[in-house]
Every structure is written in C-alpha cells, then in structure tokens.
C-alpha cells in the first residue's frame, strides 16, 4: 500500500505532462482500475507461492522417503552379505576339520596296516583310498552345493536390487514371443 502512495505523485506528473502533448493518461486510480490490477497481481503471486511451495514440499518428502527406503534395502543387503560370508567361513572351518580328520584317519590306517603285514597293507590301502575318495567326493559335493547356494543367493540379491519393472516386462514379452513362435 505504501508503494501506491509513492506512485501517485509520479502519475500526477505524467498526467500533467501528457496533457500538454496530447497524450492521455488517466490519473484517477479508481477509474483506471490500478488498485484492482495490483490486488489481482498480489493475490496471484500469493496463491502461486503457496501452491508451488506445497508441491515442492511434497516432492522433497517423496525424495527423502525414497532415499530412506534405499538405505534400508542397502542395510538389509549388507546384513545378508555378512551372514553369507559368516556361513562361508564356517563352511571353510568344517572343510579344514574334515581334511584334518581324514589325514589322522589315514595315518592310523597306515600304522595298523604296517603291523598286520604286507597283504593287509595292500587291502587296507585300497579301502582307505576308496574311503578318502568317497569322503572327498562328498566334501566336494557339499562344497559345490554350498558355493552354488551362496552364489545363487548373491545373484538373487543382485537381481532384486537391479531388476526394474521395465526389465521384467521385457523378459515377459520375450518369453511370450518365444511361446508364440513355438505354437
């Protein structure tokens, strides 16, 4: 309102100056609707400021929620990874124990074989080797299963983190197209 009071002397000067040069300027503020235009302009600025402010606040809240959700998923993935690493370490310990036990068993078998004679040595050596191979095969199988399990778990975690809806739709469309070709 203070700016309107400051504008009034300028308008009066312009109207006096314009009357000398045949340029018409209406100095009556009420007749020229200057107040209405200013009120409309200030109202429009106020409404737009509130509208844009609330929109920006909503967008900020959405971004913060998305960041928080991503951080939670990262924490979950990290805890799963550390758990998998612990399981792998435990598996390595078990493998080492089994190897030590196999070595101890082999040494005991060798001692008893030497005491019983050459014939028993050959027979027990064959049996011992067979047992060791079987144990190694089982251990290898268990290790392979554990490694495959951990690898699948890691790949699953990576797929869950990287798989977007666009990729899923492309995979589904590709499979549908393949089925259509087969029919």
Curated annotation (Swiss-Prot):
Primary localisation category: plastid
This protein's record includes keyword DNA damage: no
Membrane topology: Single-pass membrane protein
Residue ranges of the TM segments: 28-48
Any Pfam family: ATP-synt_B
Subunit structure: F-type ATPases have 2 components, F(1) - the catalytic core - and F(0) - the membrane proton channel. F(1) has five subunits: alpha(3), beta(3), gamma(1), delta(1), epsilon(1). F(0) has four main subunits: a(1), b(1), b'(1) and c(10-14). The alpha and beta chains form an alternating ring which encloses part of the gamma chain. F(1) is attached to F(0) by a central stalk formed by the gamma and epsilon chains, while a peripheral stalk is formed by the delta, b and b' chains.
Species the sequence originates in: Porphyra purpurea
GO CC annotation terms, alphabetical: chloroplast thylakoid membrane; proton-transporting ATP synthase complex
Molecular-function GO terms, alphabetical: ATP binding; proton-transporting ATP synthase activity, rotational mechanism
The protein's role, per its UniProt record: F(1)F(0) ATP synthase produces ATP from ADP in the presence of a proton or sodium gradient. F-type ATPases consist of two structural domains, F(1) containing the extramembraneous catalytic core and F(0) containing the membrane proton channel, linked together by a central stalk and a peripheral stalk. During catalysis, ATP synthesis in the catalytic domain of F(1) is coupled via a rotary mechanism of the central stalk subunits to proton translocation.
Sequence similarity: Belongs to the ATPase B chain family.
Protein name, entry field: ATP synthase subunit b, chloroplastic
Leftover remarks: In plastids the F-type ATPase is also known as CF(1)CF(0).
Domain of life: Eukaryota
Annotated localization: Plastid, Chloroplast thylakoid membrane
PANTHER family in alphabetical order: ATP SYNTHASE SUBUNIT B, CHLOROPLASTIC
Keyword terms: ATP synthesis, ATP-binding, CF(0), Chloroplast, Hydrogen ion transport, Ion transport, Membrane, Nucleotide-binding, Plastid, Thylakoid, Transmembrane, Transmembrane helix, Transport
């Amino acid at each position: 309102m203070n700016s309107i009071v400051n504008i009034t002397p300028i308008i009066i000067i312009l109207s006096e100056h314009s009357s000398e040069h045949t340029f018409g300027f209406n100095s009556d503020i009420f007749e020229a609707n200057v107040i209405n235009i200013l009120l409309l302009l200030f109202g429009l600025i106020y409404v737009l400021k509130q509208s844009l402010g609330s929109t920006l606040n909503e967008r900020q809240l959405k971004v913060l929620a998305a960041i928080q959700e991503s951080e939670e998923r990262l924490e979950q993935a990290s805890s799963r990874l550390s758990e998998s690493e612990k399981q792998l370490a435990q598996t390595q310990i078990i493998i080492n124990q089994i190897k030590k036990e196999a070595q101890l068993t082999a040494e005991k078998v060798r001692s008893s074989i030497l005491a019983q004679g050459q014939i028993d040595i050959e027979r027990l050596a064959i049996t011992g080797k067979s047992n060791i191979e079987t144990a190694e095969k089982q251990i290898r199988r268990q290790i392979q299963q554990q490694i495959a399990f951990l690898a699948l778990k890691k790949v699953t975690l990576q797929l869950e983190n990287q798989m977007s809806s666009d990729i899923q739709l492309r995979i589904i469309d590709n499979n549908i197209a393949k089925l259509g070709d087969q029919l």
